[in-house]
Regions:
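Juxtamembrane transmembrane-helix boundary signature
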Residues: 5-37, 49-53, 57
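Select transmembrane alpha-helical segments in multipass membrane proteins
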Residues: 4-5, 40-53, 144-156, 204-211
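Membrane-interface loop-to-helix entry segments
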Residues: 84-85, 95-125
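Hydrophobic, small-residue-rich membrane helices and short re-entrant helix-turn-helix hairpins
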Residues: 1, 141, 166-201
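Inter-helical loop and helix-membrane interface segments of multi-pass membrane transporters/permeases
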Residues: 65-81, 122-150, 174-184
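Selective recognition of specific alpha-helical transmembrane segments in multi-pass small-molecule
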Residues: 3, 7-12, 16, 160, ...
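Hydrophobic alpha-helical segments and their helix-loop junctions in multi-pass secondary transporters
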Residues: 89, 111-143, 149-170
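Transmembrane alpha-helical segments of multi-pass small-molecule transport proteins
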Residues: 48-52, 73-95, 113, 117
Length: 215
């Protein structure tokens, strides 16, 4: 019943991240630099603090989630799982020195593996297609339950992540392009296509999580 929240959140994320791409390509500034340069100091500091809180909240959920997954799969104690997760995060950061493109390729491979696992599970579950499609129809009554409302808020926050907007506006500048208007337009089209593909795959994974949980 909350698949429509996943779809709506994905559309919002596509819109906001496309705007961040446009900012980065058109001005050469990422979102943080643009805020620092164009906004009063009284606005900049709260925005910075909110971004830090969002990063900590997201990382905490991912850290604990990975530790729980390691416990379920291999029986590892939670503290050991947390340490292993923190270590592999540092390893990924260290891989940046080999170039951002290689790091992107590694992340894409991992995401593809996760997507393949969910695809296999969906084939094994064989959910009712009509029920799944019906979940894409917005229903406000599904949010009257407090637990459903909290879940919907979590889905929205996990899809439209504030710190991702800062990150994406910076990452689009790692690609080299000429300074002419035509090349910038081409870079913008490529960045928008990249955003749509990435968030469409994220939508499929998030939708699969809900369907599998319901099954």
């Amino acid at each position: 019943s909350l698949l429509w929240v996943v779809a709506l959140s994905s559309l919002m994320a596509v819109l906001l991240q496309s705007l961040c791409c446009r900012l980065g390509i058109a001005t050469g500034l990422d979102l943080a630099q643009a805020c620092r340069r164009l906004l009063p100091r009284g606005w900049v500091i709260p925005l910075w603090l909110l971004a830090e809180v969002a990063i900590v909240a997201c990382d905490l959920a991912e850290l604990v989630g990975t530790a729980l997954a390691l416990q379920l799969l291999f029986g590892l104690p939670l503290p050991v799982g947390v340490l292993l997760t923190a270590f592999d995060t540092l390893v990924l950061l260290g891989l940046q020195r080999f170039g951002i493109r290689r790091l992107e390729a590694l992340v894409i491979s991992l995401v593809a593996l996760v997507g393949a696992c969910f695809a296999v599970e969906m084939l094994l579950l064989r959910p009712d297609v009509a029920s799944v499609l019906g979940g894409l129809v917005p229903r406000m009554d599904s949010l009257r339950n407090s637990s459903q409302l909290y879940l919907a808020a979590g889905i929205l926050g996990a899809t439209v992540m504030p710190h991702n907007l800062y990150l994406h506006s910076s990452l689009v500048q790692t690609r080299r392009w000429s300074t002419g208007p035509e090349m910038r337009q081409r870079a913008l089209r490529f960045a928008n296509l990249d955003t749509v593909i990435a968030l469409s795959l994220a939508f499929l994974v998030n939708a699969s999580i809900l369907v599998l949980a319901a099954g």
